[in-house]
Each structure stands twice: as C-alpha cells, then as structure tokens.
Amino acid sequence: MAQEAGDMDDGQVSDSDSDMTVAPSDRPLPVPKALGGDCGLRPFQSTATACAPASHYRTVKSVDSSEESFSDSDDDSSVWKRKRQKCFNTPPKPEPFQFDQSSQKPPIAGRKKVNNIWSAVLQEQNQDAVATELGILGMEGTIDRSRQSETYNYLLAKKLKRESQEHTKELDKELEEYMHGGKKTGPKEEENGQGHPKRKRPVKDRVGDRLEMNYKGRYEITEDDSQERVADEISFRLQEPKKDLIARVVRIIGNKKAIELLMETAEVEQNGGLFIMNGSRRRTPGGVFLNLLKNTPSISEEQIKDIFYLENQKEYENKKAARKRRIQVMGKKMKQAIKNLNFQEDDDTSRETFASDTNEALASLDESQEGHGETKLDAEEAIEVDHSHDLDMF
C-alpha cells in the first residue's frame, strides 16, 4: 500500500474514492456489449429493446461531456459517432430477420397481384406447353386456375370435341344402315336399280362424276359388224355403265340407226350438251343418246317400250315396294292406336273415323305376309277377328 501511495501523482485521491473519480475516458463502453452481444444472443427481440442501453449511454455521455474539457482523443469521438449513427439510422423492421435457412416467409393472406397480367399469361403458356407434352405421352396435365373464370381448359375442350365427333360418326353410320335396310347396297345393285333406298340420294352419289364422251373410241364400227361389237363400242364411247340397255337398243333398232344416233350424240356434246327437264344439270352422254332415241320420229313407240320395258318394270316394282312399306308402317300405328283406345257402345263417330284406315291397314298387312320379300308381322301384333261383323263395329 505504501508503494502504491508513493506511485500516486499529485492531485490523486485515496483508494476509497477511486471508484467515484474515474475519468470518463477510462470507463468501459457498454455500447458494444449491448449492441453486439445482446443483438447476437437475442435475434427475436424488437429493435427498440435492443437500442435501449444505447439511449441511456447517450444521456450519460452528454452530461459528462459538459463537465469535462474538449481534450478527448479523436478515437473516442469516432467511436461515439459510429455507435450513435448505427443506433438511430437503422430503419425499423416489421419482423425480425430469421437466420434459419430452412425457414421461409409465409405468404401474406389476401394479397392481390397488381400489374401481373403478362407474367401470368407467360406462365400459363408455359404450363400449356407442359400439359400438351403430357397429353402426347398419355398423361393428363393440370391447368392453372389462378385466373378463375378466365381460365380455359383446352385439353378438356379437345377431349369433348373428339367424343362429339365420334358420337356423330356413329349416328351417321346407324342412319346409313337404317336407310339401306340394314345392308349396304353394292354399286352393281345401284346401277341395275335393285337397291331400295328410303331416301333419294344426291346426284353425285347416284350418277357419279360426269364423264366426258370419248369421241375417237377404240376402233371404227360399221353396219356390217356384229351387234355385240357395235353395242360394246357405243357403250365405251358414251361412258355408259348400263351396257345391257345399249345392247337392247342395238338389237331392236339395228346397227345403222344406232351408229347414226351415236354421231348425233357426239355433235350435241361438242356443242355443249343437253340439260335435264328442270335444268339443274347437264345430261350424261348416255342420257343424250337415249333422249335422241326417244325423240326420233323413225323409231316407233312399240320399239321404245320394248327397249325400256325392264327399266320401267324395275321402277314400278320399286315404287310398289315403297308404297307397301308406307302402308305397313301406317298399319302398325293404327293397331297401336286401336289397342290404346276404349270405344263406348254408343260412340258411332269414333268407330266410323277409324273404320276405313283399319281396313286399309289390315289389307296391307295381309299383302305383306303374302309377299316373299317383305317382312312378316309377329303373332302378337295381329288383330284378332272372330267374326266378319266385328270390323263393322269400328
């Protein structure tokens, strides 16, 4: 203690008062501890709590600086400015920063996208491209529905369109089978008129593309040639598929007249051809040939009837079969109507109304049963008639 007292300079006080008279420059700075240590150890505290010791230090510092001289070192002033600037210039943070790398900031609920339409469109296009690739591979892609009602699921639209087209094809196929009576008529049957379509087909389907006449032909024909040779050459030049009809023409009117009609047909075709009766289309070369045949005075009506007898007979049979089908359908409808109606004994008006239709329907059903080519009715559908006077009741 004596050595320590001897080492003291003039003006120093004793050890008991040393704690009260320590110079401000010799005091330890609490700011680094408060700012460095506390902020590092407690990252989840608010900024105001971390800066509270710094505010206390600033107050003490301002009081002490008024009493002491301005002989402090430049190092102390630089430290003071740096600490003060760091404390008061730090912008307030709404949330403390988390040092954990695995943690992510949760999205704010109710936040709307502002001025984000083009980026959304670009993102949707990229998703569409990915969905297309998945569709090619047989997988289903997910469509972005962030645009809610404006979202267009084109994958679903393509799928629905494909299903609709397949369904339409099936309906067309069923209708085609129904129109042809459950079987497809071949081209030969259509040419010979053996097909019984329920609807008149278009001209291109019935006649086909219009073929131009072959004026030169394969070889020259004369009156001395055989009828088969002349008929075959005329059919070739006219591009006529009904060769049997041309053969009958040559057989009935002769080689000379048939060759003359062929020359007249070639002249008419070179001048533009002939139209049909309604003027909707031009006649085929074979049609021009047959039209000239009918309008030639030197050819009698008996010859024309003999030439077109088979064609007229086929047309008549087709019309008769169509009429039978219509009557048969009407008869079935009448039977169903009669079964569903309950006539009263004194109701004469309703009985007279259905009497004629019922008789016609029953007659048509009897004719259809007699015909070998027509379909027969079931036993359940037949009307039971015990006596002949039962028909008069209707």
Swiss-Prot record:
Short sequence motif named Nuclear export signal, residue ranges: 130-139
Example of a GO cellular component annotation carried by this entry: ribonucleoprotein complex
Domain of life: Eukaryota
GO annotation terms (biological process): protein transport; RNA stabilization; snRNA export from nucleus
Localization annotation: Nucleus, Nucleoplasm; Nucleus, Cajal body; Cytoplasm
N-acetylalanine modified-residue sites: A2
Keywords tagged on the record: Acetylation, Cytoplasm, Nucleus, Phosphoprotein, Protein transport, RNA-binding, Transport
UniProt signal peptide: none
Region described as Necessary for interaction with CBP80: spans on this chain: 2-329
Biased composition (Acidic residues): 1-18, 65-77
GO molecular function term, any single one: mRNA cap binding complex binding
Keyword Cytoplasm: yes
Region described as Sufficient for poly U RNA-binding: 228-328
Sequence motif Nuclear localization signal, location on chain: 81-84, 198-201
Modified residues (Phosphoserine): S14, S16, S65, S66, S69, S73, S226, S356, S368
Region (Disordered): 1-109, 178-208, 365-394
Record carries keyword Cytoplasm: yes
UniProt biased composition (Basic and acidic residues): 178-193, 369-394
Region (Necessary for poly U RNA-binding and snRNA export): 279-287
PTM characteristics: Phosphorylated in the nucleus. Dephosphorylated in the cytoplasm.
Sequence similarity: Belongs to the PHAX family.
Subunit structure comment from the entry: Found in a U snRNA export complex with PHAX/RNUXA, NCBP1/CBP80, NCBP2/CBP20, RAN, XPO1 and m7G-capped RNA. Part of a precomplex with PHAX/RNUXA, NCBP1/CBP80, NCBP2/CBP20 and m7G-capped RNA. Interacts with NCBP1/CBP80. Found in a complex with snoRNA, Interacts with NCBP2/CBP20. Interacts with DDX39A; this interaction stimulates PHAX RNA binding activity.
Role noted for this protein: A phosphoprotein adapter involved in the XPO1-mediated U snRNA export from the nucleus. Bridge components required for U snRNA export, the cap binding complex (CBC)-bound snRNA on the one hand and the GTPase Ran in its active GTP-bound form together with the export receptor XPO1 on the other. Its phosphorylation in the nucleus is required for U snRNA export complex assembly and export, while its dephosphorylation in the cytoplasm causes export complex disassembly. It is recycled back to the nucleus via the importin alpha/beta heterodimeric import receptor.
Protein name in the entry: Phosphorylated adapter RNA export protein
Species, as recorded: Bos taurus
